[in-house]
Amino acid sequence: MGAIGGDELVQWDKMGAAEAVNGGCGGAGKMDRIQVLVRLRPLSEKEVARREPAEWECINDSTVMFRSTFPDRPTAPTAYTFDRVFHSDCSTKEVYEEGVKEVALSVVSGINSSIFAYGQTSSGKTYTMTGVTEYTVADIYDYINKHEERAFVLKFSAIEIYNEVIRDLLSAENTPLRLWDDAEKGTYVENLTEVVLRDWNHLKGLISVCEAQRRTGETFLNEKSSRSHQILRLTVESSAREFLGKDKSTTLVASANFVDLAGSERASQALSAGTRLKEGCHINRSLLALGTVIRKLSMGSNAHIPYRDSKLTRILQPSLGGNARTAIICTLSPATSHIEQSRNTLLFGSCAKEVVTNAQVNVVMSDKALVKHLQKELARLESELRHPVQSSSLETLLKEKDNQIRKMEKEIKELKSQRDLAQSRLQDLLQSVGDHDLNRQVQGKHSVRSPPSVGMPPSVSRDDSSQVSHDDSDLYKEVRCIESNRTGGNDQLDLSAGESSSPQDSNMNSGLHGNDSNASVNSRHSRPSGEAPITLEEHLENIRRPFVSLAKDLGSSTRNSSNLRVIGRSRSCRSLTGSTMFDDMEMDDCTPLNRSLVEFPGRPVESHRRGSALHYDAETDTLSRAGSMSSEISTFKDAKTNGSVACDTEFTGIGEFVAELKEMAQVHYQKQLGDQNANGKSIGLDPIEGVSQSPSRWPLEFEKKQQEIIELWQACSISLVHRTYFFLLFKGEAADSIYMEVELRRLSFLRDTYSRGSTPSNAIVGSLSTSPVASAKKLQREREMLARQMQKRLSTEEREHTYTKWGVSLDSKRRKLQVARRLWTETKDLEHVRESASLVAKLIGLQEPGQVLKEMFGLSFAPQQQPTRRRSSNGWRYGIPSFA
């Protein structure tokens, strides 16, 4: 059986009627109120002959007003508002199209519907209901003809309630029928005739039979007055046809009730007696019971509803606040003689519009589906009999135990990770404490004492000393450059060496390299065998001490020298340090940037061709650059002659710069170990054992730094796009250590600055001034941008899957913004961080992060050139841009 067709049935799908209930209702009920309409009839011929004025007037489409000034009941309201009001010139077609059509046609979608006509006698109830019934049936057949994919079966039945006796209008026998209550069917009429309709003409003939069978009589107010309540019921069953598929096996069943109530009347006005008086009494009694039920339902209380006070209310119980959509047409006479009856009708309608109904789609299983369902149920029961131990409670207990086991396994994994991290920290702490004492002991035994002239030690050749000094000096400069990111470069030690005409200056310069070499050798080989090597910062701290002791004497002598030559700084150092570290140098020239990390231990061999090392020439007492062009050599004396100094900067591309940093970090350990072993043998020391343990700690160190960076991102309100790029690019390789260290120190500086309530300097954040409030606002705007990108980047299915995955209700409002606000919020949950990065990458169009993106990320470490006038020089100020 196939799918349901039609726009009306699509609405049924939205109401949640996919789940079938055997013999009952399926889907979620739709809360609705009874729709109340008012139709004002024109004055009759008798009323016109008596010259009775029209006391009621429709002032708009929803309000009827009492316009007479006759002081009948001054406390009564003069205006009543309903869902729709039709004046006397409106036709029955308009009443149907604009009032009850939507309710009546709910029957083809599996929803029960009921249409009442309520009012005083001679107000036009039967006239209105006859036209509404014909228009409804015509539209139902028109709907059936347009939806041939479903098979429809229509059944018709008709009853009247005359003097509280139920009679079948389709039967020639005048036998009273009885009401029965059933748990599944509800209240039904026993032995009621139900005819299966062939076509529209067949139904017309049956309606004519009902009109002929109904009890009518003449009264003073009406020549042909209905003396009974008439209920016409049209049952519609629909199911998909077999040739459209076999997966659909449910049937929609609904009924439409057309209720023409007898009119209320006063005996004094109708001048009724005998039989007419008895009929009027039963009519008024049943209408009174109906009014009581409506009034109690409108109050919304849980009190008893007296449905059983009348057979009319018992039959219509599902339509009154039950499983049906209901519309009541209140017919009104505008004549002065019917003012009190008209007001009672309007009061009834005012109460009825407050009654709430719960209409549901009625889905019934077919025989085939029911048999299949019963077979499955039988198999399940037989299985339980064969295995009585496997009960539902036992299955629930097993599921709970499995959940506890998974939870404990997760906790054990986290505890193991914390244990490994604690052991690593303890090992580093013990190692650093032992190194302090061992360095002092080994320094007294193996250090080379320099003479008062600070000359070169005799046991070490000049070439080896120069090589070691350059190696350690460049290493020292690189780490100090990274530290300048935090301190702003105010406490940097600026050293300059120049050509001196006196031997004392030359010896002092040589002594500087000698002390550097000795300090590096002592720090490298002062460890017992079997321990892990000291960290890079501890090693360079030992190198820094002799520099500090010689800085004062060397600085005073070099400033007064007439042949001062500035040692070129590495390009990476100038890129990473701020401009403040050059502010203390009282000179008017610009330092040439022509060394590109030449002697860094992790420098690849092929990168040495970009710049050659500085060598000390003992014969000429000058510093020269081997293999370089003559245009790259300039002295302070030449600068005074020419009046300006040319800043010869050799900027490499961003891609080359990032590649160099990655390659240097990757081979840093192997290169350093080789240099340490060679230098150790040259002075008679044993090589360090256990050096290979150092790289093994990097995965744990990476996880630790990554977690700290993620928490600092959240604390400093860093851009989500920056977080995503950084998290996806650097995944724990040895070459990522430089990026991790720089990012961690930058974020720590921002956090400390925010905590003090100050604003980071331009040397750190570049050209952008930031604050916690500004960063939070930028982050909020970025989340709103990502929410807008979800509409563009994701399809409807992907968005719904994303809402479910991120715990956002599909019925809530601003779902995309809710998802965006949950990104990157759980800093302790690495899986949450990974999912956040994946979603942000998808929204910004990042499909597959590769080397190209790493080169783009290298821009973060490139210098920002801001022209700044410094005295008489045309220098450049460099700073690290901000990611905040």
Curated annotation (Swiss-Prot):
Tell me the protein family, please.
Answer: Belongs to the TRAFAC class myosin-kinesin ATPase superfamily. Kinesin family. KIN-7 subfamily.
Which stretches are tagged as biased composition: Basic and acidic residues?
461-483
Give the gene that encodes this protein. Answer: KIN7C
> What is the protein's given name?
Kinesin-like protein KIN-7C
Q: Which residues bind ATP?
A: G119, Q120, T121, S122, S123, G124, K125, T126
> PANTHER family under this entry?
CENTROMERE PROTEIN E, KINESIN-LIKE PROTEIN KIN-7C
Recorded GO MF terms: ATP binding; microtubule binding; microtubule motor activity
Q: Where is the composition biased (Polar residues)?
A: 498-523
Chain spans, region Disordered? 434-530
